Amino acid sequence: MELDFPLAAPASDTAMPKGEAVSIFRAQCVSRHIDIVSRKMHKSGDAFYTIGSSGHENMASVAKAVSRNDLAFLHYRDAAFQIMRAMDSSACTPIRDLLLSFSCSKEDPISGGRHKVLGSKELNISPQTSTIASHLPKAVGAAFSIGLPKSKIRFSNVKEQPIVLCSFGDASSNHSTAQGA
């Protein structure tokens, strides 16, 4: 097949380390499986929040592409990102945490059972609920704060100059909160 446009040659230093594709795939599978389990839990009366992350599994690749020091403000369906980051940390239990969140357990480390929330201080992921675009102004503020003197930055576990990653869905792009950010 002939193309109407030239393709750039791949960069020579883009080889993925051995095993990395498998770890990304594992995070994607865990994200999808948690969605299936949450729906079963809802059907049996053991879960109360079933808006899952199906269709957003490739956010695991994004998590692998950025530094753990980078601050993340995630779309509420981007559990694969959090799962991927947590897989590299022995201090996090992403599967347990998400299941606690779906079941509105008071043991949920992020919301204490009030809502299904993605987020983790350990993983530099700001807590985010399903409110459309509400995290965009926070992301802009965090990005602005990076340029402030270190004494004013409140991100305790950020060791290097981070970037701020913010993901959002199509409904957010036309929301006034997004436009304001």
Predicted segments with their positions:
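Cofactor-/ligand-binding subdomain signature composed of acidic, glycine-rich
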Residues: 1-47, 69, 96
